Structures are given as C-alpha cells and as structure tokens.
Amino acid sequence: MSIKYSNKINKIRTFALSLVFIGLFIAYLGVFFRENIIIMTTFMMVGFLAVIASTVVYFWIGMLSTKTIQIICPSCDKPTKMLGRVDACMHCNQPLTLDRDLEGKEFDEKYNKKSYKS
C-alpha cells in the first residue's frame, strides 16, 4: 500500500475551491430563512465572506506560485513547481527534492519544517 503524495500548490488551490462551494452553500441556506431577515442576511454574509476568503487564498497562492522553482519531473518529463525542500510533481505525484541530503530518503513533509534538522 503506497502513500498518495500531493503537490502543495494543488492542496491550497483545492482548499480555495472548496471555500467557494462552501460559501455558496451557506449563502443558499439563507434562502430557507426568508421570513427572518436577520438570519437570512447572516447566512448570506457568511457565505459571501467565504467566497471572498477563497479569492484571497487564490490571489495568495498565485503570488506564491510565481516565486516557486520550476523543474522538470524525472518521471513524467513535465514542468512542475516546487515549494519547500520536498514536494510532489503536480502531474504524476512523484516525490521530488532539490536537497542533496534528502536524495534517496523516504518522502516526508516534515523535511519542510524549519525545526527539522537533517
């Protein structure tokens, strides 16, 4: 049984996309409280704030994505972006590292923490 690795940028984009749908769902719940304007407005505003939060997250990951290192994945030969010391390919989820000390070691995201000493 192998562990499924995922690219950090894709994880953050998935979180932002889920915020959009959660926000729309929360705002839609407000429709069921049309008789009570306060509750309806509260649901609509919370849903709207979730959609705005997703916009902020998308903007942040877009800015972060422009600063990442682009490499060619050795498995699928497609360009991918790397955040941190270890990451996974965006296309084939192959574990990747640019740190020579980590080559050949088992993939672990703890290598990206500043408190980790190799």
UniProtKB/Swiss-Prot annotation:
Highest taxon above the source species: Bacteria
Transmembrane segments: 12-32, 43-63
Its membrane topology: Multi-pass membrane protein
Signal sequence region: none
Pfam family, one: DUF2614
Keywords: Cell membrane, Membrane, Transmembrane, Transmembrane helix
Localization, UniProt: Cell membrane
One Gene Ontology term, aspect cellular component: plasma membrane
HAMAP family: UPF0295 (MF_01502)
UniProt family annotation: Belongs to the UPF0295 family.
This protein's name: UPF0295 protein BC_0520
Species, as recorded: Bacillus cereus (strain ATCC 14579 / DSM 31 / CCUG 7414 / JCM 2152 / NBRC 15305 / NCIMB 9373 / NCTC 2599 / NRRL B-3711)
Taxon lineage: Bacteria, Bacillati, Bacillota, Bacilli, Bacillales
